[in-house]
Amino acid sequence: MEIRLAHPNEIEAIVNVLEEARAFLASSGIHQWQGEYPNKDNVFDDILSGRGYVGLVDGKVAAYAAVNRGQEEEYEAIYDGKWRHNNPVYTTFHRVATSNEFRGQGVIQTFLQGLIEGQKGPDFRCDTHEQNKVMRHILQKLGYVYCGKVPIDGERLAYQKIKHKNERSLYQEIDEDDRWLLGKN
């Protein structure tokens, strides 16, 4: 997977990924993203401000996320819990989505781990809808810990991960052509 900043000519592909994610959430009975948000304007702003990232598989937009660095007002208003560490600067992931073509293949976990490894600083935060058990499970697999609730679109569950120095994933993507290196030819 190639992970990089999104380009303006990818807006339509990214919006399509977000629309597919919205439909998936609706079909799963999850009331997250069932209004106008997220939309093309959000993606456009993300790209112009240098915080929109894509994960590409075979040149196709497979995943998207907005990466914010700094404090966020809603995150400062955490309740029914507290952050494990109160770092003044942290990284948050928003609008995390994958396309239907790559759903269920571990793309989001790989994408988020790659983003974590590529960002400076140890403090990573993310929020999700209480009903979004898939995202909650992915965050926990990545080492995030539930910390409380934040006032975003009513209420969202807030998670935090403290990255260990030089953290690298426990898995490695192996190109099909390189499988012989593992003695599986």
Language model features with spans:
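Conserved acyl-donor/pantetheine-binding loop and adjacent beta-alpha core of acyl/acetyltransferases
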Residues: 66-97, 103
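Conserved acetyl-CoA-binding loop-helix of GNAT-fold acetyltransferases
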Residues: 98, 104-117, 137, 141
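C-terminal "cap" of GNAT-fold acetyltransferases
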Residues: 152-185
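Conserved GNAT-fold acetyl-CoA-binding loop/helix
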Residues: 22-42
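Conserved beta-hairpin
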Residues: 49-68
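A short beta-loop-alpha structural element at the N-terminal edge
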Residues: 2-16
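Conserved GNAT acetyl-CoA-binding A-motif
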Residues: 112, 118-130
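Conserved active-site alpha-helix within GNAT-family acetyltransferase domains
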Residues: 130-148
